[in-house]
């Protein structure tokens, strides 16, 4: 089994990650790779913004992130239209069931 190099995750504390086992520990003299976490932090920030937008979508008075101005109440309108369509379809199913 080939030994993967350790990934230094906290240089000030000499903490490294062993990618083969997923264990975090101190560096013991093996080859160490120092990684920049900037790209990962940007992706995490984008994911957090998406998660916040998803949580905010539960409140029908909020505005979706990145939407055009004047879109207040779009979730409320979408919810009403969805319920109207579901009610219409359910009504048709019940009507056909009663007629047959």
From Swiss-Prot:
One of its GO terms (cellular component) is methyltransferase complex. InterPro entries: MtrB_MeTrfase (IPR008690). Its EC number is 7.2.1.4. Its main location: membrane. Induction: Part of the probable mtrEDCBAFGH operon. The keyword Transmembrane helix applies. Keywords: Cell membrane, Membrane, Methanogenesis, Methyltransferase, One-carbon metabolism, Transferase, Translocase, Transmembrane, Transmembrane helix. Pathway: One-carbon metabolism; methanogenesis from CO(2); methyl-coenzyme M from 5,10-methylene-5,6,7,8-tetrahydromethanopterin: step 2/2. GO terms for molecular function: tetrahydromethanopterin S-methyltransferase activity. The chain crosses the membrane at residues 80-100. One of its GO terms (biological process) is one-carbon metabolic process. It holds the Pfam family MtrB. It is a single-pass membrane protein. It is found in: Cell membrane. It catalyses: 5-methyl-5,6,7,8-tetrahydromethanopterin + coenzyme M + 2 Na(+)(in) = 5,6,7,8-tetrahydromethanopterin + methyl-coenzyme M + 2 Na(+)(out). The complex is composed of 8 subunits; MtrA, MtrB, MtrC, MtrD, MtrE, MtrF, MtrG and MtrH. Belongs to the MtrB family. Part of a complex that catalyzes the formation of methyl-coenzyme M and tetrahydromethanopterin from coenzyme M and methyl-tetrahydromethanopterin. This is an energy-conserving, sodium-ion translocating step. This is Tetrahydromethanopterin S-methyltransferase subunit B.
């Amino acid at each position: 089994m080939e030994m993967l190099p350790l990934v230094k995750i906290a240089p000030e504390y000499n903490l490294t990650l062993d990618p083969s086992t997923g264990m975090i520990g101190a560096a013991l003299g093996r080859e160490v790779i120092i990684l920049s976490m900037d790209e990962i932090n940007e992706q995490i920030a984008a994911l957090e913004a998406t998660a916040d937008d998803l949580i905010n979508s539960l409140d029908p008075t909020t505005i979706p992130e990145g939407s055009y101005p004047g879109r207040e109440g779009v979730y409320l309108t979408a919810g009403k239209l969805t319920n109207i369509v579901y009610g219409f379809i359910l009504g048709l199913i019940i009507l056909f069931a009663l007629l047959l």
